[in-house]
Structures are given as structure tokens and as C-alpha cells.
């Protein structure tokens, strides 16, 4: 049976990935080569504005990794970029859930390092499930949406830091990054953060009343 690149011949270059995104990533080579401008791109159909296209599809810093490869090696570059994004989403979610664990499940000071490690390892299925959820696997064909999945756990971590009255840079920096990397997905993340904040305020208030 057919397998997937790089082990077999089947690649992710189907649908929009083949018809749109591959030429867009190729256009970055012309941009850094000085053949085109960030303001006007001759390789875009009959020529046209490039800023809008760049902001929507290519603003992620991951996009520039493709310029380290020749155009002929773009399948490998996009494969590595996709794997990197999915892996990083698991890493950032791991940071978030470990923060929550430490916040609400503090272990006694005399707890051994082995038991602390074991406690954190029990959380491992959560970031794995987050990284390999159906959304990520589906949108591996539209990889500009994956940056939001990477940054969302950091945004939620920032909300938790705000609730703890810590520095708001924990929230501002990932929020700025997600708006720059892909402004289309950023408003969805913003709405989710607002709902998450409301949920956390309600649960905090409920716990406060219960303690009284």
C-alpha cells in the first residue's frame, strides 16, 4: 500500500496545498532573491499586491524555513515544517498543563524527585492528544492555521498569569504573535480566551463562596 512522504511517494500536496500554498512558498525564494518586492510581486498571476497574500498565508516565521531548501526540495521543507508545528503545539500545551498541575496540585516538599517526575509523566497523554487531534491532522493541508494551535496554550497560560496578578507580558506577547502570524485565526483565539477568562472568574468566585 502507498505510504506518506518522506518514506513513500504520497505527499500532502493535494487540493489547496498543491494549487495555492506550494506556489506561495515558492514565491518567498523570489522575494529573498530580489526578483520581486514585498509590495508588488510579478510572479503572482499577472502581478499584484503581495502584502495581503503574505499577511494571510506566509507571515509565520516557519514559512521562512522553506527558503533554506531549494524549490525542488519544497516537499521535504513543508513536511518538516508541518511536523515541527504539530510537535510544538504539544510542547506548548505541555507547558500549560504542567503550570496548572503545579498551581493546583502542589506536592509536599519532601516528595522525591522520582515521584515528582512520575506525577508529571501522568500528564503526558494530554499534550500528545492535543498535538495529534483531528484538527491538526486535517489542517496539515492548510498549515497556516497551525500557528494558532501552538500559541493558544500560551495565551491561556497568560490568562492564568493575569488572574494570579503577575506580569501581563505573559499574555501580551503570545497575543501579539498570533495576530502577526495569522490575523484570521487570531480573533477566534481571542474569543476563546475571553470565554476561558469568564469561566475562570466564575469558578474562582464559586470556590470563594464555598470557602466562606
Language-model-detected regions and their locations in the chain:
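Membrane-interface coil-to-helix junctions
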Residues: 1-90, 128-149
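Transmembrane helix-loop junctions and nearby membrane-interface residues
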Residues: 2, 68, 100, 201-204
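Membrane-embedded helix bundles of polyisoprenyl
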Residues: 86-99, 116-202
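Basic polycationic patches enriched in arginine
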Residues: 115-116, 209
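Membrane-interfacial entry segments at the cytosolic side of transmembrane helices
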Residues: 170, 206-212
Amino acid at each position: 500500500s502507498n505510504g506518506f512522504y518522506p518514506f513513500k511517494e504520497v505527499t500532502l500536496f493535494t487540493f489547496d496545498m498543491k494549487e495555492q500554498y506550494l506556489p506561495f512558498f515558492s514565491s518567498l525564494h523570489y522575494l529573498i532573491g530580489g526578483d520581486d518586492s514585498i509590495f508588488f510581486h510579478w510572479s503572482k498571476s499577472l502581478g499584484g499586491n503581495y502584502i495581503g497574500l503574505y499577511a494571510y498565508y506566509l507571515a509565520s516565521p516557519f514559512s521562512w524555513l522553506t527558503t533554506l531548501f531549494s524549490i525542488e526540495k519544497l516537499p521535504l521543507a513543508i513536511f518538516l515544517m508541518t511536523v515541527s508545528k504539530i510537535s510544538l503545539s504539544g510542547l506548548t500545551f505541555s507547558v500549560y498543563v504542567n503550570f496548572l498541575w503545579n498551581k493546583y496540585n502542589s506536592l509536599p516538599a519532601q516528595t522525591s524527585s522520582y515521584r515528582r517526575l512520575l506525577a508529571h509523566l501522568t500528564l503526558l497523554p494530554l499534550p500528545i492528544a492535543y498535538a495529534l487531534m483531528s484538527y491538526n491532522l486535517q489542517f496539515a493541508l492548510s498549515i497556516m492555521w497551525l500557528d494558532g494551535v501552538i500559541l493558544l496554550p500560551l495565551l491561556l497560560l497568560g490568562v492564568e498569569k493575569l488572574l494570579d496578578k503577575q506580569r501581563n507580558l505573559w499574555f501580551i506577547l503570545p497575543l501579539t504573535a498570533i495576530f502577526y502570524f495569522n490575523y484570521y485565526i487570531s480573533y477566534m483565539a481571542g474569543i476563546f480566551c475571553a470565554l476561558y477568562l469568564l469561566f475562570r472568574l466564575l469558578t474562582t468566585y464559586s470556590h470563594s463562596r464555598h470557602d466562606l
